[in-house]
Amino acid sequence: MKKLKINYLFIGILALLLAVALWPSIPWFGKADNRIAAIQARGELRVSTIHTPLTYNEINGKPFGLDYELAKQFADYLGVKLKVTVRQNISQLFDDLDNGNADLLAAGLVYNSERVKNYQPGPTYYSVSQQLVYKVGQYRPRTLGNLTAEQLTVAPGHVVVNDLQTLKDTKFPELSWKVDDKKGSAELMEDVIEGKLDYTIADSVAISLFQRVHPELAVALDITDEQPVTWFSPLDGDNTLSAALLDFFNEMNEDGTLARIEEKYLGHGDDFDYVDTRTFLRAVDAVLPQLKPLFEKYAEEIDWRLLAAIAYQESHWDAQATSPTGVRGMMMLTKNTAQSLGITDRTDAEQSISGGVRYLQDMMSKVPESVPENERIWFALAAYNMGYAHMLDARALTAKTKGNPDSWADVKQRLPLLSQKPYYSKLTYGYARGHEAYAYVENIRKYQISLVGYLQEKEKQATEAAMQLAQDYPAVSPTELGKEKFPFLSFLSQSSSNYLTHSPSLLFSRKGSEEKQN
């Protein structure tokens, strides 16, 4: 999969073209009878989306996601509240536009020649390719030529249907497929890993995130080249919403907000490692339950799951771990660092975790205040790995090479240069293994994504199982299942082998529709 990147050039060109086309409607705040005026009079921006880890998701009741965050900022830009409606599939999204139930679709939708005949696209903000997926261990097709409707199923409204039809007409006359009107792409990927379906097609970003929780999902081949992703709004004579979107994205591009959001949601990399991810998820089941209380106890200012990811990157949750350089323990502390933190036994898991957190907090406190709050942790982790002085060198090098020293996206690209003589010879603190610091932070981010998604899935599986058990045994209510006298989790561990493995996802699907007011 190609590196994901916001298409700034496309935004710039589109801005110029649309500015000319939309010039009569640019002063949209001054009109009383246009789409923007209607949104402001209503006091809310109605956005329809789908539930995926990238577009819209929730943790502890709090919404997040790339499209959600952009939509929230756009609503703030317009001075209105955001109303989010979550639909099951893409067809339902466009129904919302057709029926006047949405102002915008913000759901990672691909720009497509057929779609723009009936709907107004906005600026593009990243790109994806469409890929055929299968389950590891099953037959991997090398071509679409002989795939049949019994093997290949796609979601309703999926843009790839047009591409498949073109391929059938021009290259693979035997190709056939079916559309499942009741399921979205995420649910079809679940069916593939459950063995209910041979193949489906999804976009490369969705697949990459899905694999963090389900490494058994594999890419067979690319169906399309990279395609721009955009929002859609109604296509009519009123261009005020398009003009507002254009202004909004230009402003986000110019002040660096788009780059920061790209790094936040797409910056975890796309170099998926099946064995590493599978090994990590097995450790989540086998080792994490004993360590979780310690991570929760000492996490303090950071999410405990991030702390767990850091510890796994350091030692694979092995309290006895020792490296050739002499660092030891769960958080792999040097002897000098441990002494400065008052640690008497580096191989004691609690002492190591407590000390590691304090050391990380010290690094956090040194990160310049000019660095955005949600990026400070990455600078601190780089400093944790290679030393604070070398992190300062990385920032200085970034500034010298016309990057933004306060942007993690810019700084991390310069980290490998710290080990190259033409660069480190001119830096204050000299040589550093910057490439290792880069990999260190990237790995932690991947482990965190996997852990958050996997724990969410297990929680939902437990809830579903509880409800099913209550139906099977009506005398036991769902609330009773969590009490000591009915050890539900123990029951599950004995009765369901899937409970202790990365079994089919519930994280990536939401049936029906939901509405959230923000």
Curated annotation (Swiss-Prot):
Its EC number is 4.2.2.n1. It catalyses: Exolytic cleavage of the (1->4)-beta-glycosidic linkage between N-acetylmuramic acid (MurNAc) and N-acetylglucosamine (GlcNAc) residues in peptidoglycan, from either the reducing or the non-reducing ends of the peptidoglycan chains, with concomitant formation of a 1,6-anhydrobond in the MurNAc residue. The active site is at 314. It is an enzyme of class 4 (lyase). The keyword Isomerase does not apply. Residues 270-518 are annotated as: LT domain. GO terms for molecular function: peptidoglycan lytic transglycosylase activity. Murein-degrading enzyme that degrades murein glycan strands and insoluble, high-molecular weight murein sacculi, with the concomitant formation of a 1,6-anhydromuramoyl product. Lytic transglycosylases (LTs) play an integral role in the metabolism of the peptidoglycan (PG) sacculus. Their lytic action creates space within the PG sacculus to allow for its expansion as well as for the insertion of various structures such as secretion systems and flagella. This is Membrane-bound lytic murein transglycosylase F. It comes from Escherichia coli O1:K1 / APEC. The lineage of its organism: Bacteria, Pseudomonadati, Pseudomonadota, Gammaproteobacteria, Enterobacterales. The gene is mltF.
